[in-house]
Amino acid sequence: VVKIIKIEDWMSKPVKRVTKDLTVRKAIKIMDESNIGVLPVVENDKPIGIITERDILRRVVAKDIDLDKTNVEGIMTKNPVTINHDASILEATRLMSENNFRRLLVVKGGKLIGVVTAKDVIEVMSA
């Protein structure tokens, strides 16, 4: 018998989040000070984008963009893939695998409530 493990039991929360008008420099500072590799971008608590360390390297550093004049909206990945809070860890694993993601935003009623990472999934599988 396989026990169904729900995402909300293993997700990281609370989640640092930013709005699309924040400067890239401020977003990087939040990521650095919080020791996180992802920042969801929200509007009315609903995820509209996501910024990862990889996004910053590819879209900012490599292109020599001004960190103070560029806002988060200009570098974020729009329409991020989300997963519902009551989905199973197996569903999260499938979504991560199919999309080559290491993180998924967790929503409840369309609003951001957490993040689940590949590391979280590995911890569940090894428990």
Tell where the protein language model's regions lie, with residue ranges.
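Short charge-dense sequence patches
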Residues: 2-12, 21-26, 40-47, 102
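The conserved cystathionine-beta-synthase
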Residues: 18-35, 42, 83-100, 107, ...
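Glycine-/small-residue-rich active-site loops that bind phosphorylated ligands and cofactors
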Residues: 16, 23, 48, 81, ...
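A glycine-centered beta-loop-beta connector
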Residues: 31-34, 39-55, 96, 104-119
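Short, charged/polar low-complexity linear motifs in solvent-exposed/disordered segments
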Residues: 35-37, 66-68, 76-77, 86, ...
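Tandem CBS (Bateman) regulatory domains
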Residues: 1-14, 28, 52-82, 88-97, ...
